[in-house]
Amino acid sequence: MEPFVVKENIVASASSPMKKRRIDHTESADGSAINASNSSSIGGNDTVMNMAEFGNDNSNNQESQQVCTFFKKPTKSKNIRKRTIDADEEDGDSKSESSILQNLKKVAKPDSNLYFSSGPSTRTSGAPERPVFHYDSSKEIQVQNDSGATATLETETDFNQDARAIRERVLKKADHALKGNKKKASDEKLYKGIHGYTDHKAGFRREQTISSEKAGGSHGPLRASAHIRVSARFDYQPDICKDYKETGYCGYGDSCKFLHDRGDYKPGWQIEKEWEEAEKVRKRNKAMGVEDDDDEADKDSDEDENALPFACFICREPFLDPVVTKCKHYFCEHCALKHHTKNKKCFVCNQPTMGIFNAAHEIKKRMAEERSKAEQGL
């Protein structure tokens, strides 16, 4: 099969200048030409003229031949339905139908299963919806409950009869007298006590005021507090000043808010832990039928006795009036004093003794036990 040949035609118009128009021509295998042209022009009155020659074929054969399209149209808008003029009237109906279809799609199918949710209920009722957490005011006056903070202590003398009230009245009368107020005849003959006389220097001395006399105690005891409210705080874990505990010195001094204590102690949790461990050991030994408390005590006492020396480190003889130094070394009293006159340090560890020799009660106790055993043996 021979390939198709495309030719060009010239379209001429009677009323307009000559223009070029695209006309599809195909040539069949036997040489006959096929012409497909657009019979309409832009002006409407144009005539199409065929200016090419297509061989020896007649025009009747050309009209009877089937037109073949060479260029393939794009298929992008193949599935798009073009809107016709008659569809304008049915626009409103189509919109209503589409909305009905959408509403029908959104309707959920009934489900018999139970579902639980923490969100608000979607059921609509006649009552208006309220938020989940809503608190209404009771619209009442707040109950006055001060827990006894305004209670008054009535065990003391009444404030209008105590020493301070008497002194205030005396100073008030003296103030009136200094201002030149006239006195009654009955007032001059009435004795008002040693503090009732007119003080002509009251305006020049500061001590004639209650604020300055309170500390001096010139008008009796101070008033007790009428309103008492005690708050106690138990600090089971006091904050220790680290600087003072390690060095014995704190730059803040007495104003330091932490406790100044250099003692070593165990916190509560550590004490409880040790007690629980000891209880576990005791219960285990009790279940096994073993009593280790007495045995351990005997072992500890034996170890302590074995740790004590049996003779003086200097004279290598049994102790005579044994003494012990700060470094826990035992000597005879005579040997220790004699060595101290020559050397101020310990004979064993060469540490300063500071001249301190305490009585060795452990050695004396052991010597007494040995003496009693020897007497019983005799």
Curated annotation (Swiss-Prot):
Which UniProt keyword terms apply here? DNA-binding, Metal-binding, Zinc, Zinc-finger
Region (Disordered) residue ranges read: 14-150, 283-303
Low complexity composition bias: which ranges? 29-46
Instruction: Quote the biased-composition stretches of kind Polar residues, using this chain's numbering.
Output: 56-68, 114-125, 140-150
Q: Spans of biased composition, class Acidic residues? A: 290-303
Which InterPro entries does the protein's record reference?
CWC24-like, Znf_CCCH, Znf_CCCH_sf, Znf_RING, Znf_RING/FYVE/PHD, Znf_RING_CS
PANTHER family tied to this protein? RING FINGER PROTEIN 113B, ZINC FINGER PROTEIN 183
Query: Which protein are we looking at?
Result: Zinc finger CCCH domain-containing protein 51
